[in-house]
């Protein structure tokens, strides 16, 4: 195991934690312990029970440290898992091996932006579950290894006022980022374009706190495919493109103009598509000027409303949107068209797309032709700025 000095390693802005079995039970009133998410063992498999949900843990969610030849679809119990999947101290040991100095982790049982609790029938209990998860990720996951984890919180998406209050509460307790859906409309919620400003209470609070918004592909609970009988490779190929849709929504929602401190981090979407989207957005605005003043497909010219962005989309993109990637050679080769100051890296631990135990080596390989200043920005400087991270206080040492 090699312990790196902070300046020598990589900050990963997209990893994952499989919550320990006691996260919600430990924080629930005794009468509610069988109503909050809890684990039961069924035929050698750990099953999370919550309301009418039965949530299992596919082995494909957790492949770090396993030989490729041993990876097959199946279900896991906690006894099968590498402790680093759910234990902070063990995770930091794997991070040291991997060259990761700090890590932002998305949840598993709540799903990427808290969809599990959005779908719950008992909203009062669901709110308590959201708060319990956030307290755990701040106090125990991040608190168990100060400086090593970037606390990412979820919100009660069904009520923007409650969500805003939870962001404010958690910001005061040390949260560093807020998870949000790539497309809330697919979750049965209003879109970013909602004319009455459904999301404004939440976005206003995020704007005021300065917390970045992290959006992971799959956070709309929608898996893209072309046909019911298309092979899984089609969905795997297309999934990152969900974030191109998210970028389009943010660019044309007017939210980035109304809330100028927003920072949108697109997790696991890669960066190679960004130059085209920036160029295409400019082209669309230039060649569809009529759309600035008319409702879509409404040609009654007595109804005027400025629907177009007041700021060029390319400027909005470069001010507010950050690309995150694991392995994107084309994107790195086109950094000049994106901006090295708006790109961050991921290890995706412990998922199958991840690079453990070679994340640092992977980054150094990809960035070998990038100048030293930009390389440092991408490997950790941008993350320190966006998430307002202090330098870790742990000392550098190397052991074998």
Name each model-derived stretch.
Residues 1-11, 19-74, 79-97, 101-102, ...:
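Mid-to-C-terminal alpha-helical segments outside catalytic/metal-binding sites
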Residues 11-18, 213-218:
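Histidine-centered catalytic micro-motifs
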Residues 13, 19, 106, 181:
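Conserved residues at the C-terminal ends of beta-strands
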Residues 70-76, 111-125, 161:
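Surface-exposed, active-site-proximal loop segments in enzymatic domains
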Residues 105-119, 144-148, 163:
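Substrate-binding cleft and catalytic face of glycoside hydrolase catalytic domains
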Residues 106-111, 217-222, 349-352:
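Short glycine-enriched loops at secondary-structure junctions
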Residues 117-122, 228-238, 359-364:
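Short glycine/proline- and charge-enriched loop/turn segments
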Residues 125-126, 142, 147-150, 155, ...:
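Catalytic pocket-lining loop regions of alpha/beta-barrel enzymes
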